[in-house]
Amino acid sequence: MTVEKVDATVADFDAHFDKLFAAGDDAEGKVKLLLFLADRDASSNQTWCPDCNVAEPVIYDRVEAAAKGKEKDVVLLRAYVGDKPTWRDPAHPWRADPRFRLTGVPTLIRWENGAAAARLGDDEAHLADKVDAVVNAAN
């Protein structure tokens, strides 16, 4: 099946999230994933977060592999947290949001039935078997 990647910033996240992850939308059978990441530097195409730079290729590889082996499409909403000072602010919207309560990036969340069904934090997001467990969790 296919992987649809959608990028969002703090400013436009809610519009993308509401469209792609509506609570009553689970019937269409898509695997819905949120990936919270550090912003990229335009000149290097790398993020300011070393963990994100290591984990991203692993996550994309495992998501693509899962989509090929499933009969479901995958939606991957990549949410960029901002620059380092913005992310470090304890009042960052995604740190405070009870749906996410982010403590680090990258964070991968599988979304089902209007809530986080599986989650992988920054300390394990680079491990292929852990990514597989989140991506392939039964819904």
Curated annotation (Swiss-Prot):
Cellular component terms (Gene Ontology): cytosol
InterPro entries in the cross-refs: Thioredoxin-like_sf, TXNDC17-like, TXNDC17_dom
Catalytic residues, chain numbering: C49 (nucleophile), C52 (nucleophile)
One GO MF term attached to the UniProt entry: protein-disulfide reductase [NAD(P)H] activity
Keywords recorded for this protein, A-Z: Disulfide bond, Electron transport, Redox-active center, Transport
Annotated ranges, domain Thioredoxin: 1-136
Disulfides per UniProt: C49-C52
Family: Belongs to the thioredoxin family.
Known function: Probable thiol-disulfide oxidoreductase that may participate in various redox reactions.
Listed name of the protein: Thioredoxin-like protein Clot
